[in-house]
Amino acid sequence: MELNTHNAEILLSAANKSHYPQDELPEIALAGRSNVGKSSFINTMLNRKNLARTSGKPGKTQLLNFFNIDDKMRFVDVPGYGYARVSKKEREKWGRMIEEYLTTRENLRAVVSLVDLRHDPSADDVQMYEFLKYYEIPVIIVATKADKIPRGKWNKHESAIKKKLNFDPSDDFILFSSVSKAGMDEAWDAILEKL
C-alpha cells in the first residue's frame, strides 16, 4: 500500500462504538501508559509537528482519537493508562471503553503497544500485552525514547523489557525515537504488513 503520510488529519474522538467511523478502513490502535510518547510517535510517523497534541499533563486523552491517514487507514489513539491522578471510577470507564474497542472493532488490524525503553514495563504494560495475546490481536511493541539511552545499552534494556513482558519472539519489537526518527521506517514496515 502506498501512503502519503503527509495527508493526515484528526477525524473524530469517540467515547463508545456508536461514535466510531462507519466504514471499512483498517485501523492500527496505539496503546501505552501516560507520557510514554504516543502523541510524539503519531507526529513523527506522520511527519507532523502537532497533529496529535502532546500534553504536559498525562492522562489528557480521555477518548479514542481517530486519525485519518490518506483515506486508506487510521491510527486510533487509545487513552493512556496508569495515570494515578485520575479517579478509580474514571480509570474503570476508560478500561471498559478500551476493552470494547479492542475486542469488538472489526476494522482493527493490530495494536502498537508503546513502552518506555528506559524503564521496565509497568504492571499495566504487562497486562495490556497479555490481554492482546489472549484475544489474539496482533501486536507490535515499540520501545520509545531510545535517544535518551546510549546506543551501547539498547540491547540490555530491550532484553529486560522482553523478559518482563514474556515477549513472544514472533511479534515485532522496534526501538524508536521521535527525536532522531530511529525506528520510523521499521515501524511503518511492521504496520503496513498488518494491513
UniProtKB/Swiss-Prot annotation:
One Pfam family, short name: MMR_HSR1
Keyword set, alphabetical order: Cell cycle, Cell division, GTP-binding, Magnesium, Metal-binding, Nucleotide-binding, Septation
Gene Ontology biological process terms in this record: division septum assembly
Keyword Electron transport: no
MF term (GO), any: metal ion binding
InterPro entries per the UniProt record, alphabetical: G_ENGB_dom, GTP-bd, GTP-bd_ribosome_bio_YsxC, P-loop_NTPase
PROSITE patterns documented for this protein: G_ENGB
Cofactor: Mg(2+)
Binding site for Mg(2+): 39, 61
Keyword Amino-acid biosynthesis applies: no
SUPFAM superfamilies xref list: P-loop containing nucleoside triphosphate hydrolases (SSF52540)
Signal sequence region: none
Residue positions binding GTP: 32-39, 59-63, 77-80, 144-147, 176-178
Family (UniProt): Belongs to the TRAFAC class TrmE-Era-EngA-EngB-Septin-like GTPase superfamily. EngB GTPase family.
Function: Necessary for normal cell division and for the maintenance of normal septation.
Name of the protein: Probable GTP-binding protein EngB
Originating species: Streptococcus pneumoniae (strain ATCC 700669 / Spain 23F-1)
